[in-house]
Amino acid sequence: MRYGYTKQIALPFADAVQKTKEALAKEGFGILTEIDVKATLKKKLNANGDNYVILGACNPALSYRALQAEKEIGLLLPCNVIVYEDRGSVFVSAILPTVAMHVVDNGRIAAIGQEAESKLRKAVDSVSNE
């Protein structure tokens, strides 16, 4: 089962991260967290790896509606978006909220998940068209 929406990006890694943040902002998402996985693994384990950033993206309006419908939905928030390098290519991938929220038996959550997924797909597509 696919759980992410991924596109290869024809940009340098740092530019892809910046463009991804901008594209998410256009769709109403703010970045709550930004984790530089490569730097963290180097610091904690002295391990080398490819560039890899996890962005914790939150759309306040959608999150508010989700929390009104299901208090424990915070266990599945925020929506993670990753930008990473693999064998010299750069990729952007967003979680598919419809898949992640499938575990919640609540029709209102399903509808919010569909709306969030549409916005995330638009953001990823926007970066891939740069």
Pin down the residues of each PLM region.
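Terminal, regulation- and interaction-focused segments at domain boundaries
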Residues: 1-28, 125
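Solvent-exposed residues in well-ordered beta-strands and their adjoining turns
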Residues: 10-12, 58, 84, 95
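Intrinsically disordered, low-complexity acidic/polar segments
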Residues: 16, 64, 101-103
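Short Gly/charged-rich anion-binding patches and loops
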Residues: 18-19, 36, 69, 119
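Beta-strand/loop substructures that line and gate deep hydrophobic ligand-binding cavities in soluble
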Residues: 80-106
